[in-house]
Amino acid sequence: QVEALMNLAQLRKQGESRAIIVSATGTGKTYLSAFDVRQVKPNRMLYIAQQEQILKKAEESFQKVLGCPKSELGLFSGGSKESDRKYVFATVQTMSRPETLAQFDADEFDYILVDEVHHAAAESYKRVIDHFQPNFMLGMTATPERTDGANIFELFGNNVAYEIRLQKALEEDMLCPFHYYGVHEYIQDAPDEKIDGKDVKVESMTDQERNELSRWLEELADPNRVRYIIDKIQIYSEAGTPVQGLGFF
């Protein structure tokens, strides 16, 4: 982390306003970002993430590192609107709403942290990133590569301040050894379908029912829909616990 902090300081000295940290899960991205905020000493900071649970843990870590009173840190999400604090921890879902962004000036925060920045190509993230003009913006991720080909590095000026992948983290004993269980599939094919709420064998469908089913399947296979679903599956399955999903079409 010392190397990363030195690199970040050097990038800012060179006039760069954006950088990205690629760090395997469990190697201390949150604490690293907190230490960088401590050395920058911004007037106001915004920390963006997808889940409120992540924000609450980050808030605890930042308070330990910064040594500031809890009253200086605030949660900005669906159930909490502490946007007037010095250090604001916000869900991207809440912050990206147009009516919410309209409440903040472009230079409201002079340091912005974007966690799980591999999602930055999503419209919600783009609205937040495009709206604000901080002195410095730091993106953090363990997996910068995206299946849709979007280049996250370009969003941050191709400034990789520090990179440590999973294999290197294991070799340097930064992480405990673990067993990896691959998930081969997320869905299970059913032997029949439901038409108007009734179970119908596929082979016994009428031509009209088959055409209707084909239309539904074409809509489900829309590339944008598929990418969105894959992104959500990856987010909610990261914890390694069994996940069930329900789709409406």
PLM region spans:
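Conserved two-lobed SF2 helicase motor
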Residues: 84-99
